[in-house]
């Protein structure tokens, strides 16, 4: 505890010194960080300096220097985010733990559209199914944000913005090869023809990999679990006239993988086939002082498990319709508001339980007012009313004042509520409970973002989150077990980030994140952040070795964790202590010509032997290399 206080005190001291000298520093050009424009935090384009929340951006430039990596690998190096299973087999589920919250409490968006899987137990989407090659940038919004985005935005929002056509029509080819017989090929086409933009990407990935399950002591190696992924992305835009544009998108994905029976348990004939289609159409109407947006999307997922002839078929379908208005009343007041409708349905068949046919709907309306003054004071006030076809109505709010000094020092406070609705499985399956209420959360957050010079940035944020009606598996009635609202979860922590550019050719970003949490059940109160470290820190270093050669060094320390797994021999749940580990990766890129880029990525340089999930393996020292060729 003393160490935590000393960290905060030191950062506040630096902030005080910076503010005392703000008049001198205000004459310098502000760093790009606060001037960067994002859309996720307010549902309309705003500079980060105007937003009283923690926003982080993975830019197109960063992704361009991550060729051959995966989306989970890139997200894992953001302060306060741990991707469970990041170092495991690609077929393993990747769990997004933001600020210590469960994976279901982080909302994933693609181009602003909520991405869920109605066929899964808790409804979250596996981000390993999203190829990094279709992504232009990623905006990460931390804290409770259900007022703007509805269910699941309890710990934060990750908005994956896909590539759109710009410039002259051109093609590109990417190919990689690496450890574990891993290969990937990408063919892309992008550009603009008069008033029409188009982006088309086709991706094929294959890997023989290694056994997901770790062999128990005294057992020989298990068989390899392969992974195969095929994906297609199509984005089309049409500028109809000076005020109105339309867009359409199609993302099709198929994953085929070999699975194991569980922790320390192999399976020779267990396969998984996941296919998904996300299609949408939308439009933007420019008004005199704002914009009117509409989006209609359809998200269909099919999951098929075949375990030695025993077949499970689960399908999930989500229809989502949304209309948003952004309006500028004046230089001081902006309005964001909208209405949305979502229908979820699932059909599930397996040999072990009754067939499941279920659906429900969620309707909501929200509004958010943004105020700014010439003195630097800014505030956002918002609310959302939600109506669920099963449990009824609930309300969320946001109160978010901030203050901007000298265009480069930002202080903020954020008080908000958020919620997560129970999934179709939790409501209607053999273990379902129609009396379930949504999980409801209240969050408090405060911090600062200080740009001392154009080469130095320091940020600190503290958060506290209280979730009631936590959905758990327990006894509903005599001799009946299922899902029930019975727990209360309390989490808190802080994050520190320091960005430096000591030389024009060197960029450094260091971070430290701390989180702790306890759950209160009818029996006791205990720490329960399974698979999530209390402490994590890292350093990302970018070095331009020459005009054509760049080097990125990526280091992350993941602290001690605890885990639980089911022991198939004793038929009991076992708790395991997972030790801390350090990961060091190196990525080097050579721009051979204006159109040809060569790259190599070496991961786990220290060949660290570590565990992310008890009973499962992770990768040792591994690499991939490849090229990207542009064709006009």
Please give the residue ranges for each predicted region.
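Conserved C-terminal beta-signal and adjacent last beta-strands/turns
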Residues: 8-13, 26, 187, 237-240, ...
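N-terminal periplasmic accessory domains that precede
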Residues: 36, 71-74, 94-97, 109, ...
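Extracytoplasmic beta-strand/coil segments of soluble accessory domains associated
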Residues: 72, 76-114
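Short acidic/polar hinge/loop motifs at secondary-structure boundaries
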Residues: 114-142
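Periplasmic-side early beta-strands and strand-to-turn transitions of outer-membrane beta-barrels
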Residues: 159, 166-167, 176, 191-270
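Structural signature of Gram-negative outer-membrane beta-barrels, strongest in the C-terminal barrel
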Residues: 241, 330-336, 340, 344-467, ...
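Outer-membrane beta-barrel signature, preferentially recognizing the C-terminal barrel domain
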Residues: 265-282, 286, 404, 409-410, ...
């Amino acid at each position: 505890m003393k160490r935590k206080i000393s960290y905060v005190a030191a950062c506040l001291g630096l902030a005080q010194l910076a503010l005392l000298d703000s008049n001198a520093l205000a004459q310098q050009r502000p760093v790009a960080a606060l001037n960067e424009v994002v859309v996720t935090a307010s549902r309309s384009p705003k500079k980060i300096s105007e937003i009283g929340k923690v926003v982080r951006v993975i830019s197109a430039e960063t992704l361009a220097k991550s060729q051959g990596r995966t989306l989970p690998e890139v997200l894992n190096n953001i302060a306060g985010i741990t991707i469970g299973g990041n170092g495991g087999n690609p077929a393993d589920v990747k769990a997004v733990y933001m600020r210590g919250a469960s994976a279901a409490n982080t909302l994933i968006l693609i181009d602003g559209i909520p991405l869920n899987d109605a066929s899964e137990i808790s409804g979250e989407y596996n981000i390993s199914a999203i190829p990094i090659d279709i992504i232009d940038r990623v905006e990460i919004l931390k804290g409770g944000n259900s007022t703007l985005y509805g269910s699941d935005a309890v710990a934060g929002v990750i908005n994956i913005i896909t590539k759109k056509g710009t410039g002259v029509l051109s093609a590109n080819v990417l190919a990689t090869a690496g450890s574990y017989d891993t290969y990937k090929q990408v063919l892309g086409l992008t550009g603009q023809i008069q008033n029409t933009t188009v982006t088309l990407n086709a991706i094929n990935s294959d890997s023989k990999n290694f056994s997901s399950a770790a062999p128990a002591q005294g057992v020989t190696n298990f068989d390899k679990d392969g992974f195969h992924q095929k994906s297609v992305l199509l984005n089309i835009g049409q500028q109809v006239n000076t005020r109105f544009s339309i867009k359409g998108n199609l993302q099709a994905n198929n994953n085929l993988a070999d699975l194991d029976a569980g922790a320390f348990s192999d399976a020779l004939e267990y396969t998984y086939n996941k296919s998904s289609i996300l299609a949408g159409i939308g439009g933007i109407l420019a008004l005199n002082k704002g914009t009117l947006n509409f989006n209609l999307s359809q998200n269909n997922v099919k999951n098929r498990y075949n375990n030695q002839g025993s077949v499970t078929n689960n399908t999930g379908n989500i229809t989502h319709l949304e209309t948003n208005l952004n309006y500028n009343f004046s230089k001081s007041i902006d309005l964001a508001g909208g209405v949305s409708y979502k229908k979820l349905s699932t059909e599930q068949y397996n040999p072990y339980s009754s067939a499941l046919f279920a659906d429900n709907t969620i309707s909501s309306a929200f509004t958010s007012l943004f105020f700014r003054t010439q003195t630097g004071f800014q505030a956002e006030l918002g609310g959302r009313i939600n109506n669920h076809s099963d449990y009824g109505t609930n309300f969320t709010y946001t109160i978010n004042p901030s203050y901007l000094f000298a265009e480069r020092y930002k202080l903020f406070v954020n008080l908000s509520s958020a919620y997560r609705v129970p999934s179709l499985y939790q409501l209607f399956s053999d273990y379902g409970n129609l009396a379930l209420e949504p999980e409801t959360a209240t969050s408090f957050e405060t911090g600062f973002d200080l740009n001392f010079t154009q080469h130095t940035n320091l940020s600190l944020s503290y958060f506290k989150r209280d979730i009631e009606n936590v959905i758990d598996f327990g006894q509903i009635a005599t001799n009946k077990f299922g899902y029930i609202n019975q727990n209360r979860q309390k989490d808190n922590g802080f994050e520190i980030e320091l960005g430096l550019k000591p030389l024009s050719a060197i960029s450094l970003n260091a971070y430290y994140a701390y989180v702790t949490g306890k759950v209160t059940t009818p029996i006791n109160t205990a720490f329960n952040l399974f698979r999530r470290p209390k402490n994590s820190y890292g350093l990302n270093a970018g070095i331009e070795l020459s005009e054509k050669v760049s080097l990125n060094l990526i280091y992350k320390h993941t602290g001690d964790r605890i885990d639980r797994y089911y022991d198939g021999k004793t038929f009991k749940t076992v708790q395991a202590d997972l030790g801390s580990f350090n990961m060091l990766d190196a990525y080097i890129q050579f721009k051979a010509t204006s159109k040809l880029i060569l790259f190599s990525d070496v991961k786990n340089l220290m060949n660290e032997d570590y565990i992310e999930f008890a009973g499962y393996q992770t990768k040792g020292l591994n690499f991939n290399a490849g090229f990207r060729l542009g064709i006009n």
